Amino acid sequence: MAKVGQINASPSISIEFKTLATTAIQRSERGTVCLILKDKKATGKWYSFKTIADVEAKSWDAESMKYINLAMHYGAFKVLVRVVQNDEGMDKVLKDLEMRKFNWLAYPQAIETEDQTVVNWVKQQFGTAGPIGKTVKYVSSYANRSDHVAIVELGNGGTYKSIYGDFTAQEYTAAIAGLIAGMPLNRSADNH
């Protein structure tokens, strides 16, 4: 502590760190999930939902509705949906994702090759400048030993049971992305 007449070298740094630490939890709450879905009923490419009431169920396949419900169930701030068009390749879909800001990505209907394409894309995007830049993370059941901070590997195969039905591990990635997006820094997803 500085005495009268002495200069204290870092009083504002301490205050700034305390302020940032105090607000970090508030700033971390409720992220945005982006789902990539193949849907025959949806007519557009992009959709944004803040509550399940925003979703018009008759405009979606029953399977897609289950994935949207899974992503919203644990309290994500917003769910973006990018619908894969009939003749559209993954490169085009991923290029569109570069223009959107979101935190968590899931592709519940992906086959293993599509999943690997998304894993590679996320590794390239993570930490770069741009709309999604450092924040994008991907939940995958196919990724194995990806050894990257932006890839969450759902290692348990089998069937996941939910109030919305039974799901494969890859399908359940929508729920895991929604769960993690709904968690502030002071909560753990493994105790939810």
Language model segments and positions:
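Surface-exposed assembly/interface segments
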Residues: 1-192
